């Protein structure tokens, strides 16, 4: 017999019809409070029910084959900016090529690139449909939209006019990614786990935007990348000390997705994106569940419910940090569906839909009534799949010092995997 928590709105009480353990949660000891999840340094993708690439066995095979073929090159192309007219500034001496040399320029030179017929022009001079800006230095080479980048800048004609692409080595790319996706002052094993996950993710998704002329974006559609401008000593160290290492399943790089906090337990892929993936399974983590709360009016919720007079809400009990077996929650306790009971009948609303409507940090939540308010008490931040960044930090704090412990962290969150050096 299923055990449910039923909110009887006429009584404005939370009446448990089964035992419910709402364990108290604590922030990571000795670190910043959980409000750090509001910071862009920790990934804040609240992916819900929107369309996500379905990782079926066949699609996964094709993507991993691509990743294997590309790994030997160790280069990646990142889309930086598109527009009708763009500019860049050389931070050291550089030259411009478009099949042949278009000239050399001293450090500090600013060039403007714009659409010209079917091609491009540089400072008003026609130059072809593809232009390369190459620096003679090895450090920060170019400034684009306020950030500094290593490597080569490629300009290509695009529907919007011109697109600037950064051609850079995989390791230099990661130096500009990792500090944007995690807190650089965290434990080194947590940072290394993020570095390996980011490398693996980039390899798996390489060529994902090839139709636009590059491999990955510089924003949360893939991974946030800010080039040299974002680099720190700690994150650079993590990248270099794990150079060439990726997470593999069956010998192939995985889709190493990550999120800020699992809230005590991560989730199975099929409960978030619809299709099972063998290495994206829910696993328990230290109960640093990063609690959050949101309050909305019962009148607005009743209007959204569209079931007439709202009589009650049916949702099974939440047990933080424990595996769940009820049909309305995923294994972690993330809400799959809520039943709204009304005078016109019942309506089932998905947890993803509620997350979208009310901009919730996650679908790991419980519901209660206080007066004329509906209180949503939640835990965790993000979709709950794969690597939990706060969970990784908690593991690193507890077991820090063990040799290569970041590999243990990764293999905990990505079930049945290995960490291997592929180049």
Describe the role of every protein-language-model region:
Residues 1-6:
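Positively charged n-region of N-terminal signal peptides that target proteins for export
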Residues 8-16:
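Bacterial N-terminal signal peptides
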Residues 17-27:
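Sec-dependent signal peptide cleavage junction
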Residues 52, 95, 100-169:
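A contiguous strand-loop segment
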Residues 73, 186-374, 379-380:
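Extended substrate/cofactor- or partner-recognition/assembly subdomains adjacent to catalytic sites
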Residues 168, 185-193, 295, 382-386, ...:
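Soluble non-cytosolic domains of exported or imported proteins
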Residues 179, 183, 196-207, 306-309, ...:
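Sec-exported extracytoplasmic/periplasmic mature domains
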Residues 377-423:
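TerminUS-proximal long segments
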């Amino acid at each position: 017999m299923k055990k449910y928590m039923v909110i009887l709105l006429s009584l404005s009480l939370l009446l448990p019809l089964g035992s419910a353990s709402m364990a108290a949660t604590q922030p990571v000891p000795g670190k910043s409070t959980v409000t750090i999840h509001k910071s862009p340094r920790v990934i804040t993708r609240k992916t819900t029910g929107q369309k996500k690439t379905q990782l079926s066995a066949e699609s996964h095979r094709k993507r991993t084959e691509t990743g294997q073929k590309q790994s030997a090159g160790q280069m990646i192309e990142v889309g930086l900016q598109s527009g009708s007219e763009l500019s860049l500034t050389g931070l050291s001496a550089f030259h411009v090529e478009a099949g042949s040399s278009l000239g050399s320029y001293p450090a500090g030179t600013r060039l403007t690139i714009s659409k010209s017929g079917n091609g491009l022009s540089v400072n008003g001079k026609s130059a072809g449909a593809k232009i390369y800006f190459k620096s003679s230095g090895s450090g920060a080479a170019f400034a684009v939209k306020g950030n500094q980048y290593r490597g080569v800048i490629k300009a290509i004609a695009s529907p919007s006019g011109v697109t600037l692409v950064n051609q850079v080595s995989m390791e230099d790319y990661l130096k500009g990614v990792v500090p944007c996706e995690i807190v650089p002052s965290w434990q080194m094993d947590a940072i290394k786990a993020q570095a390996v996950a980011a490398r693996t993710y980039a390899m798996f998704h390489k060529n994902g935007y090839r139709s636009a002329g590059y491999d990955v974006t510089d924003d949360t559609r893939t991974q946030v990348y800010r080039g040299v401008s974002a680099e720190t000593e700690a994150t650079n160290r993590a990248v270099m000390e794990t150079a060439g290492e990726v997470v593999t399943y069956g010998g192939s790089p995985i889709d190493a997705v990550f999120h800020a906090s699992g809230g005590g337990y991560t989730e199975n892929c099929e409960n978030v994106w619809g299709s099972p993936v063998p290495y994206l399974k829910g696993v328990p983590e230290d109960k640093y569940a990063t609690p959050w709360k949101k309050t909305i009016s019962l009148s607005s919720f009743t209007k959204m419910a569209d079931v007439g007079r709202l009589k009650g809400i049916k949702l099974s009990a939440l047990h933080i940090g424990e595996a769940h077996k009820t049909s309305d929650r995923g294994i972690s306790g993330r809400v799959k569906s809520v039943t709204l009971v009304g005078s016109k009948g019942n309506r089932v609303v998905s947890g993803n839909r509620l997350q979208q409507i009310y901009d919730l940090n996650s679908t790991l939540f419980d519901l209660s009534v206080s007066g004329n308010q509906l209180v949503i008490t939640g835990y965790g931040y993000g979709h709950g799949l794969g690597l939990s960044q706060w969970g990784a930090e908690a593991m690193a704090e507890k077991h820090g010092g063990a040799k290569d412990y970041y590999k243990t962290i990764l293999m905990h969150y990505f079930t049945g995997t290995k960490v291997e050096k592929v180049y």
